[in-house]
Amino acid sequence: MKYDFDAIEKKWQKYWKENRTYQVNIDRNKPKYYVLDMFPYPSGVGLHVGHPLGYIASDIYARYKRLKGFNVLHPMGYDAYGLPAEQYAIQTGQHPSITTKENINRYRKQLDKIGFCFDWDREIRTCDPKYYQWTQWVFIQMFNSYYCKEAQRARPITELVKILENQGTGGLHLACTKEIHLTANEWQMKDEKSKQAILMNYRIAYLSDIVVNWCPALGTVLANDEISGGISIRGGYTVEQRKMRQWCLRISAYAKRLLEGLDKIEWTDSLKKMQRNWIGRSEGVELRFKIKDENIEFMIFTTRPETIFGVTFIVIAPESEWLTQTIISKKKDSVDSYLNLVKRRTERERISNRKVTGVFTGSYAVHPISGETIPIWISDYILADYGTGAVMAVPAHDSRDYAFAKHFDLPIIPLIEDIDISKESFDIKEGIMTNSDFLNGLSVKQAIQKVKEYIKDENLGKIKVNYRLRDAIFSRQRYWGEPFPIYYKNGIPYAVDEEDLPIKLPEIDKFLPAETGKPPLGRAKNWTYKGYPLELTTMPGFAGSSAYYLRYEDPHNSECLVSSEANEYWQNVDLYIGGIEHATGHLIYSRFWNKFLFDLGIVAKEEPFKKLINQGMIQGRSNFVYRIKNTNTFVSYGLKHQYDVTPIHVDINLVFDDVLNIESFRDWNSEYKNAEFILENGKYVCGWAIEKMSKSMFNTVSPDNIVNRFGADAFRLYEMFLGPLEQSKPWDTKGIDGIARFLKRLWNLFFENDVLKVSNSLPLDKELKSIHKLIKKVSWDIENFSFNTSVAAFMICINELTLLKCSKHSILSDLVIVLAPFAPHIAEELWHLLGNEATIFDSQFPKCNEEYLKEENVKYTVSFNGKARFILNFPKKISEENVKDTVLKCESSKKWLKNKIPKKIIIIPNKIVNIVFD
């Protein structure tokens, strides 16, 4: 019987669907295991062969866990809101609701063809009102909560109102936008608008006027992780800094817990390091400075308090709240000019850029200890929302301050004895202090402790732990996103009633963003709630993905996000697979949301993802043509060095073995219709490179074509065979032929002359050894995510069983079960051909019997007077007398004995023979 992968795969995909093979429910008789993939953006071009890599790995693991007796939750859905979906709709001139639905249908067909064990009854789409009702609900909870630093948890805002009524802000230790000092009487005297403004200072979801990354072309605010090199990752548009009123989430309140939680989860060290750096904990001192001749004080945070006597200037951020109070009139024009320059640079550019820029405000600060005057400058290397937005510059001991001082010819005072700062600053925290008043002669470590005590005793500031992590900007001036459940009454924002959720995204004709920043929802008719205007911005792309893993646990519950029964059973995700590029975006936002919901008692576990695997990238092999500059002439690869050329990506489908199909190339792009070509040996040879697989590089390979040609099982096995899961590796379609041949050999093992040949005879020792060697290897590989070596092990086992002409039912049954997680279709078919009626995934993964793996021969090290000389192989069951006799008769022994008679022969069974002689 011929192996017809197409018929087999369609047959079993239909069977699994009709029999709901992968539908899962709470079963308290089984241990649970929750496997999750980062759900995809349903883009217009569909999946390429790089996308399913992580999905296949998680599918193998989920199937394996099911075969090991676990009740496995393995769902899938679509991250359908946000920029990717909206930009595709704009490019195609269609409404995003239409394109998103079409794209989801395309993805579903592609995923189904690969044969995943997803429980599609639990599918979610972030653009579905039944889903985003709960995104809106979580936002309302954040709006109605504040964060108590003493309790280290979120509390209801109504509780804070009662505290303010009874005691004001005295003695409170709360996460806030800025410190407010208020008595109970002062609170009681406030009107409603003032009270709401004060509460906004503490809400976890709050409104604030902040500097944002504004992209005019996209018409929206972008997060830092959505920008690279000053341009938007999506579309490649220019980004600038702009102050806007935005909704924010107070993730900074959770910085300490986010940092501590990293020690409790199984994530890679590299990913944990990325999050630790992003959170950025630092210990230091917050010092109080005064502006000369003004009754104005401001605080500066420093991690180097011992350098206080080396401060020669102060630098404040261009967005600093103290900016207007420090600029003197004659400096206003130069400051304004500088601010216009800075706004075109993103935050990351400002941090990474080494070019020194700045402007003097004309004002001076007073040194808190010496009383000396210190000039106040503005520079874009200072960020407004890190620390206090101002630094005390100590150029002798900080490289950026040093560069600034050198550029503007400002004083540099060394504070460590016997150092050379003629060319660079001395940043090392060691040495003996000098030029430091009462700190002179102390070591740096001693000086730090002494100056901290002095600052505390003299009330010059306070000891403080600071975090780099900043609050998440949550507003987007776009259409395709979750509407905020917020309305405005007399200009004051209020949450809508929970029973009125969801607030559905309205249908509007013109959804394109405006460069002015006016949101598209401003065009919606009757966009009101009980007669009051609703919020016009929408939530960002990460809103729908921040708690989606919880909704999978209880997707049809109309009463709550997730029931306590469902969450207590499924708890958090046991295995999460996705890209490391989400380290400081989705992965940190999800941890924050989960901790907030944990505070509310909604979830049982504080961390959302126990174990996280970051799959590597499947790279594409790109091809290039070379156009001679300022012409429409293309020169072949081997001749390009003779000309001044520009390399241009070309669609790999127009190239075969790096030779360009010229006529197809002309038809591909009208610009090249009349192009001329300089050939080598009558051919146009293209260049090539291994790069990220991307439609912009025309190097994508569709999994549909591979599955149609070789089958889903071959595709799944080949993706795993390419290399270790966590490493990047290039795609090469030619390599899949070997996998296809392997599956045919597997199939032929079950047949002889097209007739099923299966015997119930007892298996041979060699057959048992081969299959149990495979069971042991594959079990270890799956548990350790080493799927590529499993594929090699399958090939070895099939070759061994083929040589043995194995047809034993017990051996073949174990073989197909072990193979089933990797190649489920052929395994299911062979399983039923072996006489089984239920799905193979209701069987049990076989256990390795180590007895079958014991070697038939053992190696003895032969020693003379304790010195090892050579090794001999013996049958495992040989007697000690036979070992002794064989060793003494061996020619090598005669060489070392030299006709001497052994005094003693010591034998350690299966290991050593030691011959003792004089």
UniProtKB/Swiss-Prot annotation:
Pfam (any one): tRNA-synt_1
A single Gene Ontology CC term: cytosol
Key words, A-Z: Aminoacyl-tRNA synthetase, ATP-binding, Cytoplasm, Ligase, Nucleotide-binding, Protein biosynthesis
GO molecular function: aminoacyl-tRNA deacylase activity; ATP binding; leucine-tRNA ligase activity
Keyword Cytoplasm: yes
Keyword Protein biosynthesis belongs to the record: yes
Residue window of motif 'KMSKS' region: 692-696
Substrates-to-products reaction catalysed: tRNA(Leu) + L-leucine + ATP = L-leucyl-tRNA(Leu) + AMP + diphosphate
Subcellular location: Cytoplasm
InterPro entries membership: aa-tRNA-synth_Ia, Leu-tRNA-ligase, Leu_tRNA-synth_edit, M/V/L/I-tRNA-synth_anticd-bd, Rossmann-like_a/b/a_fold, tRNAsynth_Ia_anticodon-bd, Val/Leu/Ile-tRNA-synth_edit
Binding locations of ATP: 695
Similarity field: Belongs to the class-I aminoacyl-tRNA synthetase family.
Enzyme category, top tier: ligase
Organism: Azobacteroides pseudotrichonymphae genomovar. CFP2
Name assigned to this protein: Leucine--tRNA ligase
Major localisation: cytoplasm
EC number: 6.1.1.4
GO aspect biological process, one term: leucyl-tRNA aminoacylation
Motif 'HIGH' region boundaries: 40-51
